[in-house]
Amino acid sequence: MTKLFEPAACQVDLRTGAMSAATGAYQKRFRDLAGLYADEAAFSAMRENWNDTVVYEVSEFRPNERSGDLIFGTTRMLPGKVGDEYFVTRGHIHRQSDRPEIYYGQKGSGLMLLESPEGEVRIVAIDARTVCYVPPYWIHRSVNIGGEELVMLFCYPADSGQDYDCIAKAGGMRVRIVDDGEGGWKQVDNSSWRKRDAATIAALYGLEKKEKSA
C-alpha cells in the first residue's frame, strides 16, 4: 500500500525570512563567501566587522528527495556590497540539471543571474510579488541589489540536488553585478571566468549519463 505524506502549511515571517514547520535550515556567514567577489582587498577589509555576520540563510521543507515530490523554502539575504559588487549567493546548477525551479519575491529588490553551460547570460528581476522561472540546465545565483533584506520563496523537484562546484571550476559566473554609480546596477565581465570545454558542457547537460544508459 502506498504511504501518503501528510499535507502541510508553513507561514513565512517577512521580518526574519524564517518559515514555520521547516524541516531544515542553513546559514552562510560573510567568511563563508571568500572567493566569490572580485575585490579581494575589500573583502579582507570587511572581515573585521562582517566576518561572523549571516549574509543569507535558508529555511526549507524537505519531505524527501525522491522523484515526484517537491522541496520548498525561503531565502533571506542582507543588503550590501563588497567594493562595488552586490551581495550574492554561492549559486548552483541542479545535479539533475533538467530540473527547473521557481522563485517568488516576497520582500526587497533582487536579481536572478543565470548562465547556460556554454556561457550565455540572462538576468531576471525579482521584486516583491514577482515570480521568477529558472528553466532546466541554467546555472543560477541570487543578487540583492536593494537597500533592504531580500526574501524569496523557492520551490523545485525533490530529486534535483545542487552542484556548486560548476561555478568555482569556471572561475565564477561570466558576469558580475555591480553598482552603476547612479543608484542602479550594471553587469560587468568577470575577468576570471573560463569557458567550459565540450566535455564539461556535455556533463552539465547530463549527456554522459544518457549515453551510458543507452
UniProtKB/Swiss-Prot annotation:
<dbReference type="Pfam" id="PF06560">
    <property type="entry name" value="GPI"/>
</dbReference>
<keyword id="KW-0479">Metal-binding</keyword>
<keyword id="KW-0324">Glycolysis</keyword>
<dbReference type="GO" id="GO:0006094">
    <property type="term" value="P:gluconeogenesis"/>
</dbReference>
<feature type="binding site">
    <location>
        <position position="92"/>
    </location>
    <ligand>
        <name>Fe cation</name>
    </ligand>
</feature>
<dbReference type="GO" id="GO:0006096">
    <property type="term" value="P:glycolytic process"/>
</dbReference>
<comment type="similarity">
    <text>Belongs to the archaeal-type GPI family.</text>
</comment>
<dbReference type="GO" id="GO:0005506">
    <property type="term" value="F:iron ion binding"/>
</dbReference>
<keyword id="KW-0408">Iron</keyword>
<dbReference type="GO" id="GO:0005737">
    <property type="term" value="C:cytoplasm"/>
</dbReference>
<dbReference type="InterPro" id="IPR014710">
    <property type="entry name" value="RmlC-like_jellyroll"/>
</dbReference>
<keyword id="KW-0413">Isomerase</keyword>
<dbReference type="InterPro" id="IPR011051">
    <property type="entry name" value="RmlC_Cupin_sf"/>
</dbReference>
<comment type="pathway">
    <text>Carbohydrate degradation; glycolysis; D-glyceraldehyde 3-phosphate and glycerone phosphate from D-glucose: step 2/4.</text>
</comment>
<feature type="binding site">
    <location>
        <position position="140"/>
    </location>
    <ligand>
        <name>Fe cation</name>
    </ligand>
</feature>
<feature type="binding site">
    <location>
        <position position="101"/>
    </location>
    <ligand>
        <name>Fe cation</name>
    </ligand>
</feature>
<dbReference type="InterPro" id="IPR016758">
    <property type="entry name" value="G6P_isomerase_archaea/bacteria"/>
</dbReference>
<comment type="subunit">
    <text>Homodimer.</text>
</comment>
<feature type="binding site">
    <location>
        <position position="94"/>
    </location>
    <ligand>
        <name>Fe cation</name>
    </ligand>
</feature>
<keyword id="KW-0963">Cytoplasm</keyword>
<protein>
    <recommendedName>
        <fullName>Glucose-6-phosphate isomerase</fullName>
        <ecNumber>5.3.1.9</ecNumber>
    </recommendedName>
</protein>
<dbReference type="InterPro" id="IPR010551">
    <property type="entry name" value="G6P_isomerase_prok"/>
</dbReference>
<keyword id="KW-0312">Gluconeogenesis</keyword>
<dbReference type="GO" id="GO:0004347">
    <property type="term" value="F:glucose-6-phosphate isomerase activity"/>
</dbReference>
